[in-house]
């Protein structure tokens, strides 16, 4: 008995995407790498890191140790990117070094744009900026508000500007995260550790400044969502909760740690940490979005501030337990 072979054509499988993450071992970049790894299990992830070494990132990606301003661009031909997540910033510890980093970042980004524009197939680029770019506000702002950078963003703007000005790339998208709540960075340095050290949770200035918050994992989820569901050449505000006052935020921390809250004056803050830090911690930038349907697609894990705090404090306790 002869059987007729099945000649019905089958669709060729879609090629696995290649994602690049610049700043892949940094605070946001590492979270983006993890989100890509979980969402796209068959993708090729090229993680570019500098200074920091992260074993998990090195194990689960094609890891390249490279400086943003001194990069071997032959890697772009070896692993042609479909999308680049730009989470890399040249940092500085004071106004002088931040200004120098800003100039170096500008030169580096101009070179990256030149190299990417010369590829046979241009990738989309998702640049991670921040809501400090919009400056202090009197009411909730949505995407498209004019830039008026304060604090760290005053220095970052120069480095970012080539991506805003370029006509050489066809698709540059923007992520503007609000306050990113995770077990490290500003939360640990300015709230958690001072609370344990001083016996009270600080709030800065009068405490009335409004904070829009997003959990680190939800931040990365939304940044990747800009690639998956976003529109070319569009910027998106990255946040989760309705804005709350910093005093209320401090009180929520105090309730969990069993501590009272107390103010630290803006003058005292500036005297100790400098103008840039003081501007950031006393900033009033409540954000919303004009892209409601995109936002609804994101399915956030921590949509309320109390859930964010519970998760982050649990993560901190886990880290401290491992260190003990």
Segments predicted by a language model, with ranges:
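N-terminal Rossmann-fold cofactor-binding loop
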Residues: 47-53
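NAD(P)-dependent short-chain dehydrogenase/reductase
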Residues: 170-174, 178-210
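Amphipathic terminal alpha-helices
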Residues: 2-4, 8, 303-324
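Catalytic helix-loop patch of NAD(P)-dependent Rossmann-fold dehydrogenases
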Residues: 136-175
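NAD(P)H-binding glycine-rich loop region in Rossmannoid oxidoreductase-like domains
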Residues: 53, 57-115
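Mid/C-terminal beta-alpha module of Rossmann-like enzyme folds, strongest
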Residues: 220-277, 310, 316-324
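N-terminal Rossmann NAD(P)H-binding glycine-rich loop of SDR-like oxidoreductase domains
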Residues: 13-41
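Conserved Rossmann-fold NAD(P)-dependent oxidoreductase catalytic core, especially the SDR/UDP-sugar
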Residues: 110-152
């Amino acid at each position: 008995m002869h059987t007729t072979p099945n000649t019905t054509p089958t669709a060729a499988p879609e090629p696995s995407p290649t994602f690049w993450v610049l700043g892949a071992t940094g605070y946001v970049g590492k979270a983006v790498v993890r989100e890509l790894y979980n969402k796209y299990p068959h993708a090729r992830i090229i993680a570019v890191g500098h200074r920091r070494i992260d074993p998990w990132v090195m194990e689960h990606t094609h890891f390249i140790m490279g400086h943003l301003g001194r990069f071997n661009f032959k890697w772009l031909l070896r692993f042609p990117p479909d999308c680049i997540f730009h989470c890399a910033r040249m940092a500085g510890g004071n106004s002088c070094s931040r200004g120098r980093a800003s100039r170096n970042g500008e030169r580096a980004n101009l070179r990256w744009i030149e190299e990417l524009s010369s590829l046979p197939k241009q990738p989309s680029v998702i640049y991670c900026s921040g809501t400090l770019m919009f400056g202090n506000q009197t009411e909730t702002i949505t995407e498209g508000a004019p830039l008026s950078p304060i604090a760290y963003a005053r220095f970052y703007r120069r480095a970012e500007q080539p991506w805003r000005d370029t006509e050489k790339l066809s698709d540059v998208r923007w992520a503007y995260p609000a306050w990113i709540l995770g077990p490290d960075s500003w939360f640990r340095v300015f709230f958690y550790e001072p609370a344990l050290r001083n016996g009270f949770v600080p709030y800065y200035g009068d405490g009335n400044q409004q904070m829009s918050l997003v959990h680190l994992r939800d931040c990365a989820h939304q940044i990747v969502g800009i690639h998956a569901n976003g529109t070319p050449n569009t910027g998106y505000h990255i946040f989760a909760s309705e804005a709350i006052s910093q005093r209320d935020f401090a009180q929520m921390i105090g309730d969990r740690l069993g501590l009272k809250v107390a103010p630290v004056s803006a003058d005292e803050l500036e005297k100790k940490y400098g103008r840039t830090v003081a501007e950031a911690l006393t900033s009033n930038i409540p954000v919303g979005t004009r892209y409601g349907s995109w936002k609804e697609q994101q399915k956030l894990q921590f949509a309320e501030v109390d859930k964010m705090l519970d998760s982050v404090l649990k993560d901190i306790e886990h880290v401290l337990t491992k260190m003990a």
